[in-house]
Amino acid sequence: SKVSNQQITDLVNLLTFVADDKTVQLKEGVQITDEIKDTISQYKSGGITKDNRGVLDEYYTDEKLVNAVRNLIKDNFKGKTAINILEPSVGMGNFLHAATDLGVKTNITAFEINDTTAKITKLLHPDTQINLRSFETEFVTDNGTKKDFTPQYDLVVGNPPYGSHRGLYLGLGEEEKITRYEDYFVKRSLDVMNEGGTLAMVLPSGWLNRAHKLTGAELTDAYRLPNGA
């Protein structure tokens, strides 16, 4: 039976909570059944998130695309026993499937600004650390003070927001020269990626025209998707 977004929101609020450190946690004793997964997977993105980023910034990535990305990266981690993975704008977690079955233990950290989708993702991927805050908060405080950061990820995956970089963090002096969200997410993901790491993102085709500006990274593969994909 069909369920509404509001019913799904109510359900995930019953099952999860947001800790003081802004991570989403499961409530004690919660058992995630197939029925729960089926129900919450029906959530439809829409409306305006509390950060006033509209639906355009919430991407729900196609399964075939995610599998294709996984096939491209799956042999990159031979010889490692464990890797740290970042998904900087996780949405409902579809792209996390690209980080499965890589032949190594994975420690996954994800960021999401929408309360409901962050909680859905925690229920669908309970072993992932889900942070209910924007990726920008890794680099700047709410009063504009720059934060120290260190490279820590071996793999970054995702389908980041596209379009003009706007809003609070730009105003706080966070990468003011970067005018587009996708460029910001690539640059900052590279900043926290270990030497020899892999970044695999779905980006608008126009990004390739600006890829030469990347420093400290090498573009190894680029695939153009069909229009409307």
Model-found features: residue ranges?
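Conserved Class I SAM-dependent methyltransferase catalytic core
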Residues: 115, 177-228
